[in-house]
Each structure stands twice: as C-alpha cells, then as structure tokens.
Amino acid sequence: MTLVNQVRHRFDSRAANYDNPLTAFIGERELRAIRKLVPPHTEVLDYGCGTGRTTLDHLRRGCKVTAYDISRKMLAIAEAKAAEMGFEAGFTTDPGLLEGRTWPIVTCIGVLDYYPDPAPVLKTLRTYLEPSGLLVVTFPNALSPLAWMYIAGSRFTVPAVARTPGFVRRSAARAGFRIASLSYAFPGIPPLGHTLVAGLHVQTS
C-alpha cells in the first residue's frame, strides 16, 4: 500500500471519531497562529481540509474557500458542517479540479506530518500558489515534548514525523520556497510549542 493510500485509509477509518475535545483544543491554538497569516475576505485553498476545522475558520472570516482532501469520509463531514452553518465552499477529493488554478493563500495544516520527505508535496502546493502568494504549513515540532507524545501515538497507524525549524527551512528551500515567518503553537512559546507554523513565499532569485 502506498503512503498516500495508507494516509487515506487511516483517516477514512477515523473520520467518525476524529473530532474530540483534545484535537479541538490543540486545533484552536494552531488556528490562532494561522489567523495571523491569512487575511480575512481572501481566496484560500485548504489542502488536506480533514473534517473542516481550518476551512470553517476561513469561512467564518469571510474567505472564499476551496477545500480538498484525499479522504472522502473526512471531506463529507467537513461539507456537512459547512452546510449546517450556512456556509458555501468548493469541496473536492479530485486533485484534477485543482490543476491550472492558483490562489493567493494556500493552507496545508496537519498534512505534512506523515511524509518522510515533504519537499515533493511542497512542490505540488507551489503550483497552486499565485507568484506573490503565501503557503501556510504546519509540522510537529521536534524540540517539543508534547509533539513527541503525538509521534509516539501515531506509530500504531501511520507514523508521523517531527521536524526541527532547520529541517523546515531546508525542505522549503528544496521545494523553491523561502521562510517568511515561523511561529509556534500549543503553546505559542519557542521552542516548546507542539506545532511549527510556517509561512512560505516562492523564491524569486
């Protein structure tokens, strides 16, 4: 089974029980950092939207959102939440519908955790970004004991990988990006935060 299929299977099997008080608590702390990078009332691609936490936050802030995920079951939950709240967004599991389109903001939250080499995914995300746009990505922070608890638990499904800030910078550079900002979440104190939140711009020279 390919890594993508492993990740899809993991989230299809967990979709019904994915949302819980712990993930909501951590997710809200991550959103506080993400909101600082994503202006309200802009167009956003939320790549790997899951059950919609980030997508719904964008929608609440007046953004026009395209939401993509490889898990049909996770995406269905996100779409149902949006409909219940009276929001409209473009939900899809078909990457072909993203081809040839670009956005000023692309968010990719909690996706790169599972890729031993994130550079190929970052290169794909670069094709969806306007030349002056911003890509917002997250990684488990290898300097945080909280992140290592998460890493330990993930080994029973699809193992996640923790990253140092230096690794994030190198991977971004390999994919043609430069770091515009790097912050921490849960807590928002460097270097203890569980999550690294990186804002990336395309390298121009």
Language-model segments: residues:
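Class I SAM-dependent methyltransferase SAM/SAH-binding core
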Residues: 51-96
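Short, glycine-/aromatic-enriched active-site segment of Class I SAM-dependent methyltransferases
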Residues: 141-159
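Conserved class I S-adenosyl-L-methionine
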Residues: 1-39, 41-50, 143
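Acidic carboxylate diad motif detector
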Residues: 137-139
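A short glycine-rich, Lys/Arg-flanked "PGG" loop and its adjoining helix->strand segment in the class I
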Residues: 119-131
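A conserved beta-strand element that flanks and buttresses the S-adenosyl-L-methionine
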Residues: 107
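Short alpha-helix
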Residues: 160-175
